[in-house]
Amino acid sequence: MDISKPVGSEITSVDFGILTAKEIRNLSAKQITNPTVLDNLGHPVSGGLYDLALGAFLRNLCSTCGLDEKFCPGHQGHIELPVPCYNPLFFNQLYIYLRASCLFCHHFRLKSVEVHRYACKLRLLQYGLIDESYKLDEITLGSLNSSMYTDDEAIEDNEDEMDGEGSKQSKDISSTLLNELKSKRSEYVDMAIAKALSDGRTTERGSFTATVNDERKKLVHEFHKKLLSRGKCDNCGMFSPKFRKDGFTKIFETALNEKQITNNRVKGFIRQDMIKKQKQAKKLDGSNEASANDEESFDVGRNPTTRPKTGSTYILSTEVKNILDTVFRKEQCVLQYVFHSRPNLSRKLVKADSFFMDVLVVPPTRFRLPSKLGEEVHENSQNQLLSKVLTTSLLIRDLNDDLSKLQKDKVSLEDRRVIFSRLMNAFVTIQNDVNAFIDSTKAQGRTSGKVPIPGVKQALEKKEGLFRKHMMGKRVNYAARSVISPDPNIETNEIGVPPVFAVKLTYPEPVTAYNIAELRQAVINGPDKWPGATQIQNEDGSLVSLIGMSVEQRKALANQLLTPSSNVSTHTLNKKVYRHIKNRDVVLMNRQPTLHKASMMGHKVRVLPNEKTLRLHYANTGAYNADFDGDEMNMHFPQNENARAEALNLANTDSQYLTPTSGSPVRGLIQDHISAGVWLTSKDSFFTREQYQQYIYGCIRPEDGHTTRSKIVTLPPTIFKPYPLWTGKQIITTVLLNVTPPDMPGINLISKNKIKNEYWGKGSLENEVLFKDGALLCGILDKSQYGASKYGIVHSLHEVYGPEVAAKVLSVLGRLFTNYITATAFTCGMDDLRLTAEGNKWRTDILKTSVDTGREAAAEVTNLDKDTPADDPELLKRLQEILRDNNKSGILDAVTSSKVNAITSQVVSKCVPDGTMKKFPCNSMQAMALSGAKGSNVNVSQIMCLLGQQALEGRRVPVMVSGKTLPSFKPYETDAMAGGYVKGRFYSGIKPQEYYFHCMAGREGLIDTAVKTSRSGYLQRCLTKQLEGVHVSYDNSIRDADGTLVQFMYGGDAIDITKESHMTQFEFCLDNYYALLKKYNPSALIEHLDVESALKYSKKTLKYRKKHSKEPHYKQSVKYDPVLAKYNPAKYLGSVSENFQDKLESFLDKNSKLFKSSDGVNEKKFRALMQLKYMRSLINPGEAVGIIASQSVGEPSTQMTLNTFHFAGHGAANVTLGIPRLREIVMTASAAIKTPQMTLPIWNDVSDEQADTFCKSISKVLLSEVIDKVIVTETTGTSNTAGGNAARSYVIHMRFFDNNEYSEEYDVSKEELQNVISNQFIHLLEAAIVKEIKKQKRTTGPDIGVAVPRLQTDVANSSSNSKRLEEDNDEEQSHKKTKQAVSYDEPDEDEIETMREAEKSSDEEGIDSDKESDSDSEDEDVDMNEQINKSIVEANNNMNKVQRDRQSAIISHHRFITKYNFDDESGKWCEFKLELAADTEKLLMVNIVEEICRKSIIRQIPHIDRCVHPEPENGKRVLVTEGVNFQAMWDQEAFIDVDGITSNDVAAVLKTYGVEAARNTIVNEINNVFSRYAISVSFRHLDLIADMMTRQGTYLAFNRQGMETSTSSFMKMSYETTCQFLTKAVLDNEREQLDSPSARIVVGKLNNVGTGSFDVLAKVPNAA
């Protein structure tokens, strides 16, 4: 597009619809009939897919327009389909309406009055009248309610019983009432729409917002659900057959059952033959005579009377089409609203034709060109699909002809049947071929293994599809890409361009009298000599290439540049010269990934001869996240003045000094420049006159115009005798003096640097940086001053003098430090890394103490004595158990790590810097680390001291199955080194094992980085797509692209993040009062502002707040609204946020002395300046705050580790962090998050002991926690309960901890324990046994779990606490679900007595005994065991009546239990016996019992697993629960502050506390994720994201479900599932208003945010 020629028309909206068959035929240039594409000579065949009517091909001219391949636009053709085919994209909707249709009366099966109600509601929603659509339900007529079915159904049901006359009468009354109700509703709708139109709430074209869209979606879904719920037609009372589909190709009709057929016969309606659309003559009277017509006798499925009574019948698409045509004609009243999201102004009828395809569009030839690979020519894949359709069409035509011929010749029925079945198969095939062409995934019988040929849908979707690859982003001309290399000598806002690019990139510059000389020379230089030109554009737009011309020819053209061409009229454009890129041109530089706006900035060009790469200044590396190890960057050369203006004034590098993420600087000097700055500004740096002047001249370069004065100003020397010397600080002062504006006061600044005073020696004050009137008086300049750091000298200059000065200072300092370091050199040798002999001794001594650390940690975790030797068998045994359990090993890792980390920090703090051979500042290593130039204390300590503990996924090095971490260690070795503690240092080398561990840790980091990139990239894409249209309006409100209000003010106070950093630095502002006064120039603004109203009001509110803010319910009954809510801050001076006002007033109150000392500045003046500063810090209208918010969350997420592993156990609750947590909050908006938590603030008067007790009382207690050991004894022998059958028995003996211990630790009584075992544990155990047996006997399904055929019992319904168990689909599960009572034959008293006797004898037998035990120690005191066993035998023999009754009850309720006893006295043990059939395979019973112990719950508050009492943070004492149950906590107000409960479960908070609380939770949770990594993201971005997620009063995810309600179809299509959204847009006949940025990009319009948010109108001069 040539923007120099304006166009009078533009696209303002796009309507979606479906082309009818008639329209396709009208558009088509030719019908395609021939499947052959080319003839033998390779020429296109007439009627084939490359027919010349569809476009020029193979150097043949197009027969439609007569143009060649270059200019012919292409023309579409069409293929006539022999039968209507289902459109695969609309198949689901077709299927819904087919199932909802009555095949007798051809209405929807839902009663007409209900359908009318939906029609009315949908019509109201077309005009955006949501409230009125809800009120419609209130319209009733006497006893008849619109939503009641009862009247109608009652009338229908009674029809049969009443006499004919009575039935007719009641029907008449009913229909009269219903018609009256319909007309009443229609009247209401008409009035509501008319009123809304007159009030201006809607328009003739309707109103369509995201909320209306959401309501409409819900209503249509509800309508479809209602339609499909009716089995019998509400209108005629007939049963229609059900349908089923097979893929997207076939629909079958299912036969009715006898009862339904009888009902239909009684009603006596006739079903039409929808193939021929003729009424059948006879009633459905049950006779199944074959039709006389031969054709119909074999045409099964043609005649409704001859359909089979059972099974399914294939229905032809013709019949489906005819059914739906009739239904759609009769149901227009509702369908015209279902299929139009806006008022249907065209009044076209909604037809069912949309669901079918009679004609297939053939794309023009130019879009289906064959691909060439060397000599081979491959046919286009689309042609293959279209050829198949043509071939099948011809087959159907031939079969039809054959059938007609056979019918005429009266050939036998069998032969005709064969032809007919082939015809049916061909119908299915053509449907399949059409499906494959439209959507390859919907074609049946795809060849396995082969990738299917992509259809139309595949061409649109995914990253490689039309939308994302060719519309949302395109390849461009006038761009270059090369490797970048550093260049500290160019300006920070420049880019060094190599000559190879400079002679290729051109700009079309119009020739004027002002640039004629320059352009003439460019033309003479030609295309190969820089600065030259490549071509000239004449007034008529024709181009003259200079390539290949001689110098004389070029001179001749150069001399005619201002001479107009002879045949051109007077009012024309100038000639243009396509000149080479030249110095000071502006280009856009971009480094991918483009994560935030600073990844693409405008640089000025500096062409550097003899270079081959792009040259970038060091200060830009932070913004681009670039390094010079081979990174490549893209350079784009804007091609018109508009783009150049934006690149120069908005996207320029100087303006990107602050990042919008947090408002902190993103550009600054790095590495060697910082080291040089430290040395240059240190107290012992002195320079002679020659050096001083050389440095000043070298860095300022006055000939390039970098000075702000006419000549360089220098300072007098500090030392005059013996010869003049200048300090490094004076050089800095001189630089500032020459680059800051001469008409403004010098800067005043007090700040701190990174290097503490003690490093410089006693009495040093170099840690404090002091600038007074632009002179550096004290302090070292390091990273904190001119790096990318807040409140340093460069940041302060940016605030006071603006971005240009800050950028210039960075450039000049960069050159100064480069020159300085070139002269003095900076190096780092081995001496800088050495420790003194004493230092080495300290290191060795401290590391000696670490020998026992691992053993002590292991002893502590295993509860053994501190002095236990490392080879103690009990220790090793316990360690083995711990290391086999993930949670326990986590605790061991945490304890060991904390101990060894203490040693590491002890070594480092002792040896560095006290033990280093060279001391700072002579130690270059220390100088780099301390000043922030490179590295940190960690790097220094790893080189000099030790590497420390290697961590993998937050844990120590994992252990192999053998119990070793590496083969060179012993199993379960406790030495810290075996767990990955590296005592070696890089200075003296590390051992092979240590090297291996270090490599493991390094590998984890690399994998994490690779995986993280895609995760965070997708997260950012989701955010950007949802927020892309959110912008600042001219009334300071934040709105979405369609005008939906998101926030009343950006961040609540309308402040721009990049302007707020110094807003509350009042002392700095006071010090620089006069400079700021000059900057803001209040005198020029006063006449445009209201300076009284807001100030008066704010005084009133401030007074009221001071007086009443201490009152208890002050916030609930505020008298005055905040001043920002009443007065627009852009217009009224003094309209500031309450927060800012309070801070300002507090500063003025506390610092009144400062105003007395400062000359001429009083409090009133300062307050006015700060209010003006607030006004000048407002966000600009048009700012795309949505995209900035998404970038500000997306970009820092790449710095987070992907998986953060915080294991449960060490006084901390398990919590998801990092990108997984961000995805959980933002992308899935999950209602069931991985680690839900509540934070409960404890009252101050509750002691820690009470808090711990409360913790225990609400924590979940499992049976496994009170069990000391389980012993299982397995025996095989004869069963005593089942008539002597062989049985396999298991005696399970559970030994608990001491009763006092578990009641004290968990507050559990022995009665509770017994209750859990008998009511819950045994049920679960039996279920697990059945499951295990089933698993073992998969082959013999029915015979399992029969155990001993003792009692006909089953597993009873288990306790409510076991709901969480996820069983397979067993018998038990179905019993649980249906809550059925289990039936069994209860044994009588005699039988019980017999059983008891048998049990006693079996105890004494002990046949084939096999003991399993998981006891903690095997070499226990044998006597004690025997003693306990004796007491158990005695207890079993001497059961009292209560115990016997309990045992018999348990036995009677369970399948396998034959004996049960519990220690009621001391609660020390429980024993029971299980009997299974002898042929049951051996079970690992101990494992099963252990597992069930862990699943059996003694006590639990629903949804809360455990509660922990972490260490207080910031003095706040809290409890943290795993799991969320607010209601349960509300009852605990004696211990906790119920009003202060918070949770990380947004969905739970929304449900309980409402949407505002949920919004705040989202903000807090995202902020928590970032704060863990010390990343600061402004709360404004988080507020905006939270507001967008909760804007509909719900918790909407940033995924395609959350996007569904958006009004921009193009935006949804360019995101994901293009065809799904396209289908919906087409079916709803949606209108795309082109409001959203994505939609505007699709149609090539300028975006309506930023500089596109307004139009510039030129004043038309009055006609003379």
Swiss-Prot record:
GO BP annotations listed: nucleolar large rRNA transcription by RNA polymerase I; ribosome biogenesis; termination of RNA polymerase I transcription; transcription by RNA polymerase I; transcription elongation by RNA polymerase I; transcription initiation at RNA polymerase I promoter
Alphabetical keyword list: DNA-directed RNA polymerase, Magnesium, Metal-binding, Nucleotidyltransferase, Nucleus, Phosphoprotein, Ribosome biogenesis, Transcription, Transferase, Zinc
Can you say where in the cell this protein is located?
Answer: Nucleus, Nucleolus
Enzyme Commission number: 2.7.7.6
Q: Which CDD domains match?
A: RNAP_I_Rpa1_C, RNAP_I_RPA1_N
InterPro entries for the chain: DNA-dir_RNA_pol1_lsu_C (IPR047107), DNA-dir_RNA_pol1_lsu_N (IPR015699), DNA-dir_RpoC_beta_prime (IPR045867), RNA_pol_asu (IPR000722), RNA_pol_N (IPR006592), RNA_pol_Rpb1_1 (IPR007080), RNA_pol_Rpb1_3 (IPR007066), RNA_pol_Rpb1_3_sf (IPR042102)
- Give the modified residues of type Phosphoserine: S889, S1636
Compositional bias ranges of the Basic and acidic residues kind: 1393-1414
Region: Disordered, residue numbers? 280-310, 1343-1423
**What is the first-listed, main subcellular location in coarse terms?**
nucleus
Record: residues binding Mg(2+) = D627, D629, D631
Q: Which residues form a coiled coil?
A: none
**Catalyzed chemical reaction(s):** RNA(n) + a ribonucleoside 5'-triphosphate = RNA(n+1) + diphosphate
The entry marks the following residues as binding Zn(2+) 1, namely C62, C65, C72, H75
Q: Which GO terms describe its cellular component?
A: mitochondrion; nucleolus; nucleus; RNA polymerase I complex
Which residue intervals make up region (Bridging helix)?
992-1004
Give the highest taxon in the source lineage.
Eukaryota
Q: Does the keyword Transcription apply?
A: yes
> Which residues of this UniProt protein bind Zn(2+) 2?
C102, C105, C233, C236
Any single GO molecular-function term of the entry would be: promoter-specific chromatin binding
Q: How does it assemble?
A: Component of the RNA polymerase I (Pol I) complex consisting of 14 subunits: RPA135, RPA190, RPC40, RPA14, RPB5, RPO26, RPA43, RPB8, RPA12, RPB10, RPC19, RPC10, RPA49 and RPA34. The complex is composed of a horseshoe-shaped core containing ten subunits (RPA135, RPA190, RPB5, RPO26, RPB8, RPB10, RPC10, RPA12, RPC19 and RPC40) where RPA135 and RPA190 form the DNA-binding cleft. Outside of the core, RPA14 and RPA43 form the stalk that mediates interactions with transcription initiation factors and newly synthesized RNA.
> Function of this protein?
DNA-dependent RNA polymerases catalyze the transcription of DNA into RNA using the four ribonucleoside triphosphates as substrates. Component of RNA polymerase I (Pol I) which synthesizes ribosomal RNA precursors. Besides, RNA polymerase I has intrinsic RNA cleavage activity. RPA190 and RPA135 both contribute to the polymerase catalytic activity and together form the Pol I active center. In addition, subunit RPA12 contributes a catalytic zinc ribbon that is required for RNA cleavage by Pol I.
| Similarity section | Belongs to the RNA polymerase beta' chain family.
> What else is noted?
Present with 2840 molecules/cell in log phase SD medium.
Q: What is this protein called?
A: DNA-directed RNA polymerase I subunit RPA190
Q: Which organism is it from?
A: Saccharomyces cerevisiae (strain ATCC 204508 / S288c) (Baker's yeast)
